[in-house]
Amino acid sequence: MKQAIAGVVAFDEEITVMIVYPSIAGAPGGIGKILGRLFNIQIGIKPLTVGNLIALASAPLCAGLWIGRVLPMNRLPIIGTLSKKLGLAPQRYRITTKAILSEDAFDGSTVQETIALDSFDEIEIAVDAGQSWYDCGDLIFKQAGAVTGRLESVSRPESFKAACIKSQMSFVGVKQAI
């Protein structure tokens, strides 16, 4: 059985530590962020606020956006071509024992971005107004103040940041020991 902890497996092996799917706040065209801003409207008496009523009415649209972010719609013959043109290719963020990857959500066959675990020393979380309702944010990776990578609309960014930092500390510690 393979362990998903840097330093426990052989240093040259790459094992998955954690996988997270982006929130629908990152949907193309900014529609997810627009909906998030609308859902945050607190006019009214809770739980019957304007934002909650808009969220209820737009549930089918949000379900469609979520399905488009997770399921491999880009692999279907006719819908796939359209989804690629609209930027609806589903993706996921995966922490391994060597890097943080932004890749194809279905099978990880296409990697869009790679952030090596030794290429950052700080991670910032930037939460846009349209992202706060979804409990998501952008993770900005920095090395000596310079941006080395960015992951957009990460669900529950605090826990993903903690996992990134733990993996980075383990990787760098093992690398220095070897």
How should each PLM-predicted stretch be described?
Residues 1-178:
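N-terminal basic, Ser/Thr-rich segments that initiate or prime the first beta/alpha elements at protein or domain
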